[in-house]
UniProtKB/Swiss-Prot annotation:
GO cellular component annotations of the record: cytosol
Annotated EC: 4.2.99.20
Organism: Escherichia coli (strain K12)
Listed name of the protein: 2-succinyl-6-hydroxy-2,4-cyclohexadiene-1-carboxylate synthase
Entry's family note: Belongs to the AB hydrolase superfamily. MenH family.
Amino acid sequence: MILHAQAKHGKPGLPWLVFLHGFSGDCHEWQEVGEAFADYSRLYVDLPGHGGSAAISVDGFDDVTDLLRKTLVSYNILDFWLVGYSLGGRVAMMAACQGLAGLCGVIVEGGHPGLQNAEQRAERQRSDRQWVQRFLTEPLTAVFADWYQQPVFASLNDDQRRELVALRSNNNGATLAAMLEATSLAVQPDLRANLSARTFAFYYLCGERDSKFRALAAELAADCHVIPRAGHNAHRENPAGVIASLAQILRF
């Protein structure tokens, strides 16, 4: 079994760019940014429980990494960058730390490296279980209306929130709930030490208005790019800014 994805082919000899979306997104999420890099072959992946991979369920990050590895092999992708936002960034960091043949580097936008103590994990587990129950039992429009009121999305205006609620409500609540439970921050290990000892290139993007993830970025041994005029979802709020940062990274 492999993950559903959309492949776009570029010039031979350059590494692939493999894009991983955030929670409740899909393979279209990164395309406005990714299509600015037409010289590179691009793979836009649907993570388990999402988009064309909605019917695929996993028990945890190990399963996601295994599916990602098999998907890369199926597309004969031998050299690649992982580019991930939020959940996709966490998947990228986990997979990279577990080892992926052909990995050139990881570019993470607003991805959490992991909670650092049992108290934080227990608190997150309680919170995520409440969201899981809501995704299972309530209309998605109601759930996402509250989801986008969370502090991390404070930079969104009302129109942006309405647009995201409408877009994300096209998902399947049950498969979102399963993926949220399987990849909760409560079950993700703290990756800071692994990332410090990494053998791959590591870059971190965060919006200038995303104070939480700017603080997290400062804890990581990563080259950090702050995206102007953007909050947590920088590639949506300022795609040109993210394109500029990716172009700078890929020139090295």
